[in-house]
Design a protein with these regions (language model features):
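Short loop/helix-cap segments at secondary-structure boundaries that form the rim of catalytic
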Residues: 39, 86-89
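C-terminal capping region of solenoid repeat domains
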Residues: 94-106
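Acidic, glycine/polar-enriched metal-coordinating patches/loops
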Residues: 59-69, 81, 88-92, 106
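Consensus positions within tandem repeat domains that build extended binding/scaffold surfaces
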Residues: 11-14, 35-37, 65
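A structural signal for alpha-helix termini and helix-coil/disorder junctions
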Residues: 15-16, 91
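Alpha-helical elements of the RecA-like P-loop NTPase motor core of helicases
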Residues: 35, 83-86
Length: 106
């Protein structure tokens, strides 16, 4: 779990996710993500984002999915924010991978 109070997630911390099995939980305070959520990796990763307002992606094209080449990552967001995430810039490019947190079974 990423500690509460973190507002900015730096580039490169999730670039290779080989074999990650535990969920990564971002706090409600997260505002920006630099780079991709996940980039390459043969293991799945579940990401839980508690932020009600979808964090803004910095440093990637608005035409590029934040998952890059990783199609095994699933992102769980607050149920009440699901629609916001599915239409937000960049997030909308990975809509099949965004789920309400109430569906998370981990």
């Amino acid at each position: 779990m990423i500690e509460e109070g973190v507002t900015d997630w730096p580039t490169g911390l999730f670039y290779t996710m080989y074999g990650v099995k535990k969920p990564v939980i971002f706090p409600e305070t997260l505002k920006t993500i630099h780079g991709y959520i996940a980039n390459q990796g043969n293991g799945y990763i579940n990401i839980i984002i508690k932020a009600i307002i979808p964090p803004v992606f910095v440093g990637i094209s608005t035409k590029q999915s934040p998952l890059y080449y990783n199609s095994t990552t699933e992102v769980y967001v607050p149920d009440e924010s699901l629609k916001l995430y599915k239409v937000a810039e960049n997030w909308k490019l990975m809509v099949k991978h965004i789920h309400p947190v109430s569906e998370y079974q981990g």
